[in-house]
Amino acid sequence: MDRFFQIMRPRPGAKILDVGGLPALNGVPGLWNDHTTTYKITLLNLPGSFDRFSASELAHYELIEADACNCQLSQSSYDLVFSNALIEHVGNFQRQKLLANFILSASNNHWVQTPSPLFPLEAHCDVPFWWFLTLSQRKRMISEWYHGENPFTARQMASTRPIWASRLRQLFPDSQLTVEYFLGFPKSQIVYRRRNDVG
């Protein structure tokens, strides 16, 4: 998050929409846990996504339950739209485009981050060079996970689409593209736009 704050510099009180955000994930506090008193955070996620959280976990957030690919808000409703590791899960290019259009319409400023398919370990299943395996190899592994001990991973990988840099440029043509590296490998890709003061 350090890079996000350095580049986007949201002001105290900024209205931030986290598309795909949750208050916690697998027991780990969410990205905004230390910032809920500084910013007005709204989490948008699919219906039912917040049901497993307690009232105290949700207390500092505004919540929207909707499919971001089919959601309408007032134009530029937020000072900033943030999305981390969501766009690769929404489906085909048409749905990716719907999500991108929603993000672009909800604010003049955005930060969209997604794992790089070039990183040696796939971010969701930890299989080396997953996106360079043949389709039949990937299908076989997903089938084994379904019928084994990893049905969640199977469902996740069945719906994940790699987002290459060229696709990000198509989806966000007026945004800056930057890459985060780890041990010399591209680990994540970020498209961002900061048109005016955030907040």
Predicted feature descriptions by range:
Residues 82:
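A conserved beta-strand element that flanks and buttresses the S-adenosyl-L-methionine
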Residues 174-185:
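Conserved S-adenosyl-L-methionine
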Residues 17-71:
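Class I SAM-dependent methyltransferase SAM/SAH-binding core
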Residues 90-106, 114:
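A short, conserved alpha-helix within the catalytic core of class I
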Residues 154-176:
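Short alpha-helix
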Residues 102, 109-139:
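Conserved class I S-adenosyl-L-methionine
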Residues 85-89:
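Short catalytic micro-motifs in class I SAM-dependent methyltransferases
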Residues 1-14, 25-31:
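Conserved alpha-helix/loop element of class I SAM-dependent methyltransferases that forms part
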